[in-house]
Amino acid sequence: MKKVEQTEQTVVNETSGFIIMHHLASFQDNDLESVVSDYTNESVLVTQDATYKGPGEIKGFFVAFMEHFPKQQTSFTLDKVIVNNELVYIVWHADTPTLEVSFGTDTFIVRHGKIYQQTFAGQMKFIN
C-alpha cells in the first residue's frame, strides 16, 4: 500500500489494539495467511452482504476482497481507531486501481489475542 495514515486514536487496551494493528498491517502487506491467523474456529465476520464463520469462510472473503488492494497501488487512510477493552472500532477510507472506498468501518471483538467477532461495512464504488 502506498499510503497509510492514522488521524485519531484512543487506546484503553493495548492487547486488543496490537492485534488489530497486526491485522491491518497484514492486510496492507497482502499477507493472506497472516490475516487469517488473527481468527479462530469460532470467529465470525459479518458484512453487508454475508456472514462468514471460521477461518475457511473468512479466508474466502479476504481472497476476493484483497484482490482490490494491491501493494504499492493503494492509498489507505485510517481515520479513527477506538480501543475499549475487547472492543475495537475503526473508520477508514481507501483508493485502489479498482475500488474507491469513501467510507469503511469495522468493529472488532478481540478475545485471548484473536479476533472473535468482526463487522465490516463500507461505501464502495468499483472502477472498471
Regions found by a protein language model. Name each.
Residues 1-11, 25-28, 46, 59-128:
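A beta-strand edge to alpha-helix "cap/lid" segment located at domain peripheries
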Residues 30, 49-50:
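Conserved short acidic donor-positioning loop in nucleotide-sugar-dependent glycosyltransferases
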Residues 44, 50-51:
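Short active-site-proximal "capping" loops at secondary-structure junctions
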Residues 15-26:
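Solvent-exposed, amphipathic alpha-helical segments
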Residues 29-42:
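Short, well-ordered alpha-helical segments enriched in acidic and aromatic residues
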Residues 51-60:
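Short beta-edge strand/loop motif at the mouth of beta-sheet-based domains
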